[in-house]
Design a protein with these regions (language model features):
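Metal-dependent nucleotide-binding catalytic modules
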Residues: 8
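A Zn2+-metalloprotease active-site environment signal
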Residues: 2-5, 17-282
Length: 282
């Protein structure tokens, strides 16, 4: 039974491969749709709780700025991956002055914290780098990849320990996948999100040179150490060198003339923003 369990796992690994937008091979034991469904549940529960506590920002000036930047990025994300036009793109600003963070779940549900806006004080170009980076995690299916890696680790461990009980293997692996929703991305994923994010931002009309200044600000925000946002990110020296090389490649996208289209986000009171049918020019 032990050999059979390992054989099943090996066959699954061979067949469960995907390719990210950068061409990197990914392990995918969890479907993107499953990751989106579970992320949606977590997002709705989280936002409902925050709304009841009065922690969702309603300041129209802040929301307009965030919606404009993310709206322009979303258009470019859809161009890069047309299937994401079916996602329920959402964005919320969470009132937490201590949290220097932002994120985007599978399916395009986003949030950023007032701590990032207050402590980093990003320009629009810098904020576009943050949100472009986070959107890139969703584009590259990093949530499902993270869940898949957790399933593999747990499945192999259980397969060795209790190979005679395949139900236990699956239950444990699925539990590990759910836990992975709350875990950080790997450094490989972070580097990939840097690469995709700076391109999204440049194509959306935001200066790619802001990437370097943003991460310098982020590195300083933690005082004696980096903020949580950077806990699994590449080392600052390596990151700055990589971004500097990318800046020159991205400048032609940024310098293209003409208006940049913006995806319209319609916001109901105390609810995650939901999409309208068509993009509109800013």
């Amino acid at each position: 039974m032990y050999r059979l369990t390992l054989a099943i796992l090996l066959v699954t690994l061979v067949s469960a491969c995907a390719t990210s937008p950068t061409g990197r091979k990914q392990l995918m034991l969890v479907s993107e749709q499953s990751a989106i469904s579970q992320s949606k549940q977590a997002y709705v529960q989280t936002m409902g709780k925050l709304s009841s506590e009065g922690k969702l920002v309603t300041d129209p000036k802040i929301l307009k700025r965030v919606d404009t930047i993310t709206g322009r990025l979303i258009v470019q994300a859809i161009i890069m991956r047309p299937t994401t036009s079916q996602w329920e793109w959402s964005v919320q600003v969470i009132d937490d002055p201590k949290e220097v963070n932002a994120w985007c779940m599978a399916g395009g549900r986003m949030a950023l914290y007032t701590g990032l806006l207050q402590k980093i004080d990003p320009t629009d170009d810098e904020l576009a780098q943050v949100m472009g980076h986070e959107i890139s995690h969703a584009l590259a299916n990093h949530t499902a990849e993270r869940m898949s890696n957790a399933m593999l680790s747990q499945g192999l461990a259980l397969g060795v320990g209790i190979a005679a009980d395949s139900a236990a293997v699956m239950a444990g692996a699925q539990g590990a996948a759910m836990l992975a929703l709350t875990l950080p991305n790997s450094r490989t994923s972070e580097t990939e999100a840097d690469r995709i994010g700076i391109e999204l931002a440049a194509k959306a009309g935001y200066d790619p040179r802001a990437a370097a200044t943003l991460w310098q600000k982020m590195a300083k925000a933690g005082g004696g150490g980096p903020p949580q946002f950077l806990s699994t990110h590449p080392a600052p020296g390596n990151r700055q060198a990589t971004l500097a090389a990318l800046e020159a490649q991205m400048m032609p996208y940024y310098e293209q003339p003409g208006p940049r289209p913006m995806y319209q986000l319609a916001r109901a009171p105390a609810q995650p923003a939901v999409k309208k049918n068509a993009p509109a020019l800013q």
